[in-house]
UniProtKB/Swiss-Prot annotation:
Residues 157-197 are annotated as: Disordered. GO terms for cellular component: cytosolic large ribosomal subunit. Its main location: cytoplasm. Gene3D superfamilies: 1.10.1200.240, 1.10.1650.10. It holds the Pfam family Ribosomal_L19e. It comes from Xenopus laevis. One of its GO terms (biological process) is translation. Component of the large ribosomal subunit. It is found in: Cytoplasm. This is Large ribosomal subunit protein eL19.
Length: 197
């Protein structure tokens, strides 16, 4: 059997692939051995004596299956973990995500006039101070603040109404007393006049 190293090298150059991807027909070794130029190699390729092997299949099916399982939380237990908790999910990244979510919510509420700029500013600072763990807690806090504000306003209005009512009653009572005094004075003056006559 003759050496076909040259032919393999030329074939890999002609077929634009690696030498291990070149298949030389073992039944036609003599004919292949006679070919010592690229032109002759091209002819052999055309005749089918030299073939480029297909790409080896490297399936990702198992990998996809495992990835789907991991999304469900499989193969992610204590024994499978290599890095620290901070390496697996950086605290800074989770903090940034939380800040962006909460600040976006505050901005949206301010633009839609659900909260005024004073409340926005105080809540913004509280968000920065790590008061709210997530969006739901912040929303509940805002609703509570608004309810408290409405309740205070209602109580203030009721107190004001009560004050004005008592004021009016006092005024009417004073007017009645004044009118009574005037009547008494008038009746006394009339009696005095009749007594003089």
């Amino acid at each position: 059997m003759s050496m076909l190293r040259l032919q393999k090298r030329l074939a890999s150059s002609v077929l634009r692939c690696g030498k291990k991807k070149v298949w030389l027909d073992p039944n036609e070794t003599n004919e292949i051995a006679n070919a010592n130029s690229r032109q002759q190699i091209r002819k052999l390729v055309k005749d089918g004596l030299i073939i480029r092997k297909p790409v080896t299949v490297h399936s990702r099916a198992r990998c996809r299956k495992n990835t789907l399982a991991r999304r469900k939380g499989r193969h992610m237990g204590i024994g499978k973990r290599k890095g620290t908790a901070n390496a697996r999910m950086p605290e800074k990244l989770s903090w940034m995500r939380r800040m962006r979510i909460l600040r976006r919510l505050l901005r949206r509420y301010r633009e839609s006039k659900k909260i005024d700029r004073h409340m926005y500013h105080s809540l913004y600072l509280k968000v920065k101070g790590n008061v709210f763990k997530n969006k739901r807690i912040l929303m509940e806090h805002i609703h509570k603040l608004k309810a408290d504000k409405a309740r205070k306003k209602l109580l203030a209005d009721q107190a004001e109404a009560r004050r004005s009512k008592t004021k009016e009653a006092r005024k009417r009572r004073e007017e009645r007393l004044q009118a009574k005094k005037e009547e008494i004075i008038k009746s006394l003056s009339k009696e005095e006049e009749s007594g003089k006559k």
